[in-house]
């Protein structure tokens, strides 16, 4: 399977800054290698601008959030229909900042997962433990609970739309990176849980690592067992560092 590199810009970059960054990325001589799938998750207001700049590119656009209803009295929210209208084909679900800062509950994450898959969106479902849960020895149970809560009873035809991102909460934006053994252990566990839930087709689900990924550590992380890509935060905000990450892990 192809390595997937996903860029989560979070609440960064206005439209002009987003346009400038994409123009710089697309003009770099390295180019986007065919060995990589690339998804960008910009702020909502930059989606249209970026989509226009990427119309001749293999890079695709996703949204960082949406509300699981087709329309209605949900002040401040965005629907999947609206995202389709601006050309989004991916959505990010369950990111630790939405779980722990915004306060999204497992039931909402489950609703979002199932609705997005039913609409034909590809999704990156984020899971991961807090520092307190890790210290209490709860990593395995937390990851299994998050997966089972979100993915129980999803139709087999939707498996190809699903990507999992392991993001230990204590490593998000902190500069701390999980050790290689921690990553291998978590990704191997995730792969086992997915197999128990879904069966052999789960082998087609890509598992990404996210957590203070940068151009210096990307290659070594991609070499690890059961790591099929990266979810990149701050290091995706600059064209130079993001291009290095895109090219990490192989020689042309």
Swiss-Prot record:
- Does the entry feature the keyword Isomerase, yes or no? yes
**Reaction(s) catalyzed by this protein?**
D-glyceraldehyde 3-phosphate = dihydroxyacetone phosphate
- A GO biological-process term: glyceraldehyde-3-phosphate biosynthetic process
* Matching SUPFAM superfamilies: Triosephosphate isomerase (TIM) (SSF51351)
The pathway entry for this protein reads as: Carbohydrate biosynthesis; gluconeogenesis; Carbohydrate degradation; glycolysis; D-glyceraldehyde 3-phosphate from glycerone phosphate: step 1/1
What keywords were assigned to this record?
Cytoplasm, Gluconeogenesis, Glycolysis, Isomerase
Q: Where in the cell is it found?
A: Cytoplasm
The question of whether Cytoplasm is a record keyword is answered with yes
What EC number(s) has UniProt assigned to this enzyme?
5.3.1.1
Q: Which residues bind substrate?
A: 8-10, 173, 212, 233-234
Matching entries from Gene3D superfamilies are given as: Aldolase class I (3.20.20.70)
The main enzyme category here is isomerase
Segments forming a coiled coil: none
GO CC annotations? cytosol
As one GO molecular function, the record gives:
triose-phosphate isomerase activity
Q: Which Pfam families match?
A: TIM
Q: Which domain of life is it from?
A: Bacteria
Q: Which residues form the active site?
A: 95, 167
Family, according to the entry, reads as follows: Belongs to the triosephosphate isomerase family.
> Which NCBIfam families does this one have?
tim (TIGR00419)
State its role: Involved in the gluconeogenesis. Catalyzes stereospecifically the conversion of dihydroxyacetone phosphate (DHAP) to D-glyceraldehyde-3-phosphate (G3P).
**Subunit annotation:** Homodimer.
The protein's name is Triosephosphate isomerase
- Organism of this sequence: Lawsonia intracellularis (strain PHE/MN1-00)
């Amino acid at each position: 399977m192809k390595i997937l590199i996903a860029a989560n810009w979070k609440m960064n970059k206005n439209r002009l800054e987003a346009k400038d960054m994409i123009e710089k990325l697309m003009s770099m001589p390295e180019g986007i290698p065919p060995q990589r799938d690339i998804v960008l998750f910009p702020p909502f207001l930059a989606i249209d601008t970026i989509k226009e700049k990427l119309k001749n590119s293999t890079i695709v656009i996703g949204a960082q959030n949406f509300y699981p209803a087709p329309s209605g009295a949900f002040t401040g929210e965005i629907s999947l229909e609206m995202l389709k209208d601006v050309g989004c084909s991916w959505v990010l679900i369950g990111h630790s900042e939405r779980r722990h800062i915004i306060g999204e509950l497992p039931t909402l994450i489950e609703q979002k997962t199932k609705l997005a898959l039913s609409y034909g969106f590809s999704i990156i479902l984020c899971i991961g433990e807090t520092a307190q849960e890790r210290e209490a020895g709860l990593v395995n149970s937390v990851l299994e609970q998050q997966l089972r809560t979100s993915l129980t009873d999803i139709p087999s035809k939707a498996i190809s739309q699903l990507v999992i991102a392991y993001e230990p909460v204590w490593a998000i934006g902190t500069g701390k990176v999980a050790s290689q053994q921690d990553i291998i252990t978590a990704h191997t566990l995730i792969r086992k849980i997915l197999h128990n839930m879904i069966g052999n087709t789960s082998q087609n689900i890509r598992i990404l690592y996210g957590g203070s990924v940068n151009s210096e550590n990307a290659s070594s992380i991609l070499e690890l067992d059961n790591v099929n890509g990266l979810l990149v935060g701050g290091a995706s905000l600059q064209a130079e560092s993001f291009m290095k990450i895109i090219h990490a892990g192989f020689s042309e």
